[in-house]
Amino acid sequence: MKNLLLGVFTLCTTFLSAQEYHWTAYNFTVAPEDLEIVGKLVGDYFGAEGNKAAGVSVFLFENHFSDNGMNFSHSLIFTGTIDAVGAQYALDSGAKWQLFLTKMNRYTNDYSSAAGKSVISYGKPGSHPIQNLYSMRIEDQTKFAKAFTKYHSKYSPSDRRVTLGRVGLGRSPDGETHYILVGVDDFKTAMSSGSYRENNKAAMAAWKEYWENTGEVKLIRSSTRVMLGKW
């Protein structure tokens, strides 16, 4: 965990640019018997005054539904503007931070890390606890974003958040370049996220048109994560 965090913290300031929000993700495995300890370590550290920059949100997620190529149990994710994330990195160099990393290292095994940014978002802002993540390789971001915008600006349900984003650092050998993140409030919606189109012929036709106009796209994998905490 310590090596993952330090490595991406060093690279991140060269990557971020001022659009929507930026994120860094650190994936690791925790034994079930140690999860309560790890959750408390994260909550105690980022919940304490002075350990989190203004405008930064910190999330702990459980990796709930995934294929065997995503062999980790949890993710620690930071989001914010370029200025907020930059300020967070400036904080993370003192003795308290080093002690936090040392403690985390006792209970976690590193898996991977990545950094990226959102490009376009639609729907209800907020911290939706259930999130479906679709990793893709997109050949033409401009073309895909145009089709994404045309559909979601009109048909995306108001009770969720749908985001098109880009992976900038830490791409896997599978070659994902982008992702779509769908945040919802319950598992029923997560497991039937397209059901709102079933009795809406216009939405069905628009969905078909959307995917006919995205350019070349390959789905790399899909997964579902569950929010355990936010600070």
Residue spans of the language-model regions?
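Short S/T/G/P-rich N-terminal loop/turn motif that feeds into the first structured element of a domain
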Residues: A18-W231
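Sec-dependent N-terminal signal peptides
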Residues: N3-T14
